[in-house]
């Protein structure tokens, strides 16, 4: 639905246009303007744990809805380089084109890689400042699993997850046990909702209060 709704919008925000997905519709002067707050919510979440992505290197696992939002917004935030990892599925070619377009638009080095190439993945994480899981691994039937092995972590890494149920995924727990700074998915969930509320009503959602009392 986030993808299909784009064609019904009168305008798209820069982020929504690059992502090809809308999660928030603003009615302004009789026009429907499509926004995507997922990526910005993710960036706000990692900034809240003290990580500024500008000029950094990131490895993002997953190129679906969440992954696309994450790596697109990171590029808009002017990171130095992004390694995107995904399985070679039926969307591989279209993802490759989207990644190339993003790189051309932002001037950021963005590349797509096969998640099954574990040696290459390990090398990418080794040179990265930020590691993001933007897949469903860690939730639902995949709860208790991780796409990342502990040996791939290093002491200069910040680890983030887009999964918010459970509150602490295996990846986040593993990173915490390793002594790393982490950002769980519930923060992204709340931040993207706060950005949507700001667009709709012009009000500031009490994110810290909600997270403390309801999660």
Which role does the model predict for each range below?
Residues 79-106:
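NAD(P)-binding Rossmann-fold cofactor-contacting core
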Residues 34-36, 55-76, 86-87, 91:
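Glycine-rich adenosine-cofactor-binding loop
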Residues 162-215:
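Adenosine-phosphate binding glycine-rich loop
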Residues 108-182:
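Rossmann-like adenosine-cofactor binding region
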Residues 76-81, 177-181:
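Conserved S-adenosyl-L-methionine
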Residues 28, 51-57, 154-155:
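Short helix-loop-beta connector
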Residues 1-49:
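Phosphate/diphosphate ligand-binding glycine-rich loop within oxidoreductases
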């Amino acid at each position: 639905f986030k993808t299909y709704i784009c064609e019904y919008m009168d305008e798209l925000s820069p982020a929504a246009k690059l992502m090809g997905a809308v999660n928030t519709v603003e009615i302004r002067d009789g026009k429907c303007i499509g926004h995507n707050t997922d990526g910005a919510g993710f960036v706000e979440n990692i900034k809240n744990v003290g990580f500024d992505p500008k000029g950094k290197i990131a490895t993002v696992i997953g190129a679906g809805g969440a992954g696309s939002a994450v790596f697109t917004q990171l590029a808009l935030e002017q990171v130095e380089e992004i390694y995107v990892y995904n399985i070679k599925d039926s969307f591989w070619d279209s993802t490759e084109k989207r990644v190339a377009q993003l790189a051309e638009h932002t001037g950021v080095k963005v590349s797509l890689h096969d998640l099954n190439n574990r040696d290459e993945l390990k090398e990418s994480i080794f040179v990265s400042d930020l590691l993001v899981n933007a897949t469903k691994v860690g939730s639902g039937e995949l709860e208790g699993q991780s796409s990342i092995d502990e040996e791939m972590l290093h002491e200069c890494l910040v680890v983030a997850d887009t999964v918010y149920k459970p509150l602490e995924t295996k990846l986040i727990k593993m990173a915490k046990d390793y002594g790393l700074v982490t950002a769980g998915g519930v923060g992204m969930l709340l931040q993207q909702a706060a950005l949507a509320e700001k667009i709709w009503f012009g009000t500031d959602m009490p994110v810290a209060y909600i997270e403390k009392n309801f999660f």
